[in-house]
Design a protein with these regions (language model features):
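Interfacial helix-loop-helix junctions of multi-pass membrane proteins
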Residues: 40-41, 192-196, 228, 261-287
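Interfacial segments of alpha-helical transmembrane regions
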Residues: 79-87, 152-188, 196
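N-terminal transmembrane-helix/juxtamembrane module of multi-pass inner/ER membrane proteins
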Residues: 2-57, 76, 80-151
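Aromatic-anchored segments of alpha-helical transmembrane domains
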Residues: 26-35, 89-95, 178-186, 259-268
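Membrane-interface loop-to-helix entry segments
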Residues: 51-55, 136-150, 223-243, 278
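Transmembrane alpha-helix/helix-exit interface in multi-pass inner-membrane proteins
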Residues: 94-110, 174-205
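Membrane-interfacial alpha-helical segments at the cytosolic side of multi-pass membrane proteins
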Residues: 153-160, 234-252, 282-291
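Membrane-interfacial catalytic/cofactor-binding modules of polytopic membrane enzymes
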Residues: 183-249
């Protein structure tokens, strides 16, 4: 078999989001290895308890080895393979702090502050403190944490509905949005308003003790020091709304109060500049447009090089089998 054919079989035996994870693994593992070999990190405050670079490198390597073993040896573990993209996204996310520091792109925090002031004539997160109230603080905090649930929950509902097309389009669109956002974090490091201009606020945000604690716990993740641009919270919230409107309309209406609260809450909670949100929305529309197109192209390439598409219970040998009448269901 020619080398190009073997390479094509190897690449297109994977799903697109799996290849993306492996591509991210290389610079991430290199950065973690270099950071682990360097002098010990000195992190202040709650972040001092953050696991060291070596421990996180071993975790990342272990997840990657498990994934390769899963693809090779356990094709019947279909659900495990379906959730692995989110495992990779989470694993890469918690290591981005080292990647940002290692590649040391210029910090654009001051530029974001200036752009916000030029757009509005004032700094929006400072202006929003006039609305501070314990109820709003708790509500926006809950919405903010739901970032970790909105996209995956939509995917799970589509999975249980056994709608293969909608599930694949949703999963790939969300993962694309996340990885593009990760690139933004590394290329344009920026701090959140709460860290960049703490002296500008005259009103402290307080709600219930438990939710106050969860907000304070964010300081234990070093990425929050430089992971503001673009706003992936807002990007994924809007993307989940758009995907739900297209694929699961009733869930769109369920999400509306929480997704809206999340977007508004990033300003109220001083987590993002408005420019971060605009940049996140650009990612949203791009991922929403690209996800289905990349999935369909990948299916064609998989049929061409691998001879079939066998993903999470789906097994087809022709494109006619792959997308009958424009819709694809779970294989039996």
């Amino acid at each position: 078999m020619p080398f190009a054919q073997r390479l094509g079989r190897t690449i297109f035996h994977l799903r697109p989001e799996e290849l993306l994870a492996l591509v991210f693994f290389v610079p991430m593992a290199y950065a973690l290895a270099r950071m682990a070999a360097a002098s010990r990190d000195v992190l202040a405050g709650p972040a001092a308890a953050y696991p060291g670079a070596l421990a996180r490198l071993l975790t990342l390597a272990g997840a990657t080895i498990f994934f390769l073993w899963l693809v090779r040896m356990k094709p019947q573990w279909k659900f495990a393979r379906d959730v692995m993209p989110f495992v990779f996204c989470g694993n890469i996310y918690v290591n981005l702090h080292d990647l940002i520091r290692f590649y040391s792109a210029p910090d654009i925090t001051t530029d974001l502050y200036r752009w916000d002031v030029r757009l509005f004539g004032f700094e929006p997160t400072v202006w929003a403190e006039r609305f501070a109230h314990p109820f709003l603080t708790d509500y926006f905090t809950i919405c903010y944490w739901l970032f970790y649930a909105l996209g995956p929950l939509l995917g799970l509902l589509l999975y249980l509905k056994r709608d293969r097309v909608a599930f694949r389009y949703t999963l790939l669109s969300v993962v694309l949005c996340l990885y593009l956002g990760y690139v933004g974090y590394v290329a344009w490091p920026a701090s959140a308003p709460r860290l960049a201009i703490p002296g500008a606020y005259s009103v402290a945000l307080h709600g219930s003790p438990l939710l106050d604690f969860t907000r304070e716990a964010i300081a234990g993740v070093p990425l929050t020091a430089l992971g503001a641009f673009p706003s992936l919270h807002c990007a994924v919230a809007l993307l989940a709304l758009m995907l739900a409107w297209r694929h699961l309309r009733w869930f769109f209406w369920v999400q509306i109060p929480f997704a809206t609260g999340l977007i508004v809450g990033t300003i109220y909670l001083r987590q993002h500049w408005v420019v971060d949100i605009f940049a996140g929305f650009v990612l949203t529309f791009f991922a929403f447009w690209l996800g289905p197109r990349l999935e369909r192209w990948w299916e064609r390439m998989a049929l061409r090089y691998a001879g079939s598409v066998e993903w999470a219970g789906l097994k087809v040998d022709t494109m006619a089998d792959a997308i009958p009448a424009g819709r694809m269901k779970w294989g039996g």
